[in-house]
Amino acid sequence: MASADELDRREREILRALVQDYIHTGEPVASQPLLSRHELEWSPATVRSVMADLEALGFLEKPHASSGRIPTERGYRLFVDTMLKVRPPSVADRDRIERLAQAAPDVSSLIEGTADLLHSLSHHAGVVTTPRPQADPVRQLEFVRLRENRVLVVFVSEAGIVTNKLVQLEFAMEPAELERAAAYLNEKLHARADAAELAALRAAILTDMRADQSALHDLLQKALVLAEQSFAGTGVEKVVMEGESSFLDAPEFSDVQKARALLRGFAEKDRILRVLDRVLTAQEVQIFIGAESEFATVPDVSVVAAPYGRGDRVLGTLAVVGPTRMNYARVIPLVDLTARQISRALAALSEGG
């Protein structure tokens, strides 16, 4: 099979025009409509012949014998890599992204708002991973007593990001006890590089409990329970998604079985994380087209993703997931700008926290 750089100018121009038309219409493209919409310098017979050649080379395919042609994943890849002209986000889009970055009161709101905004701007699914615990472990805890047995836990990460969690205890703790428990746990967190892992923290507390027979023993027991409830569910990278159902509006997913398979793919969070974690070492936007993404067991899905972080520390990934027929020229700069603005917002939140 010929490589992409072996295509001549005529083949490239016709492929570019056809991909643009298919992205716009969602309908297989025939030679005559292609000529009427583009200022191509060749005859209809020449265009038909070139389209047949591009099909033989694996860049186009015919979904039906009597229809026009559509791009294959290989055709999309060549288009994105060598023919695509991205355009900067509009002023309105920039304003919406900047407003979210400036207005989010905390990290959770920022992550959820980003997924929703990516969906709203792209009309595809917006996906954001929460900051990875291994990249940004907890280094300080604070406990705020709301009621006798209801405690607000404030986590401060190594990068300075602040998150909160409500914990319901089966016993009461006085403010002074909470203060002592926080001081004790923070000492353990600072003493070991891996102490943010619950297992290591628990082992350190149990060691102290076995060695201590004084009144402090009761506090250590409470601190252990408090730590376990505080860290429960925090050591796992999570995925926030908005707009998965937008796929159902695309003609490519009008088949019920195909749509169901796609939605099952969205439900497999581990699969999504594997895809997005591939972006963590990248310096810029990454585009996975069709089978490249391994996002789902169905074809026609692409992922446009970028890492976000604070300073030189990469914390997570954000992405737009849509049909391979997505408007890459618009989506790629949207993802890029959003990642940069969210990174700035995280820096501001950590400094403010």
Swiss-Prot record:
One of its GO terms (biological process) is negative regulation of DNA-templated transcription. This is Heat-inducible transcription repressor HrcA. The keyword Transcription applies. Negative regulator of class I heat shock genes (grpE-dnaK-dnaJ and groELS operons). Prevents heat-shock induction of these operons. It holds the Pfam family HrcA_DNA-bdg. Belongs to the HrcA family. Keywords: Repressor, Stress response, Transcription, Transcription regulation. Coiled coil: none annotated. InterPro entries: GAF-like_dom_sf, HrcA, HrcA_C, WH-like_DNA-bd_sf, WH_DNA-bd_sf, WHTH_HrcA_DNA-bd, WHTH_transcript_rep_HrcA_IDD. SUPFAM superfamilies: GAF domain-like, Winged helix' DNA-binding domain.
